[in-house]
Amino acid sequence: KSAYNCCASGKFKNDWVNLCALSNCIKQGARFLDFEIYSYGGQAVVGASPSSSYDFKGTYNCLPVGQVFSTVKAYAFSGQTPNPNDPLFIHLRVKSNNLDVYKQLAKSLGSTFSNLLAQGNSEYANESNGENLTAKPLIDFIGKTIIICDNRCS
C-alpha cells in the first residue's frame, strides 16, 4: 500500500496536515509514504499543495520533518502496523531550492533511521552507484528504509 501526501488529513488546499493522518496510514499497512517538503522560515517542513509550484504550500499549517520522521519510526516498525518487517519506502518531493533544507533532511533522516537505512552495503547509497535497485530481491530490504528524493518541479 502507498499513501500520497500522507500527512494530509483531507484536501491539499485550505486544510491541515497532522501526525494523526500519518499514523493512520501506517496502521493501515502503507509502506510507501509520500511527503511534500517545503522550506518554511528556513526549516524543512512537511505540507501539501494541489500545485507543483515551489512557492505555494496549500495547507494552513506544516510539520517539522523531525516530528514526522519520528512518528514514522515509532509506528512503521512496531506491532501497531500489520507488516512491521516489510521494507519501508519514504518518498520526499522536495519543493525548495534552499540547500539548508536538504542538509536538514539528511541530518534528520540519518539520526532517526540510522540503523534502519538500507546502507549496510554502500552499493545502495548515492543513486545506488548506477546499480538498478529494482533488480535486487525485495528480501534484501526486509526491516530497512529506502529513501527516494525527487526535487523536480513540473
What are these regions (language model features)?
Residues K1-S154:
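Catalytic cores of phosphodiester-bond hydrolases, prominently lipid phosphodiesterases
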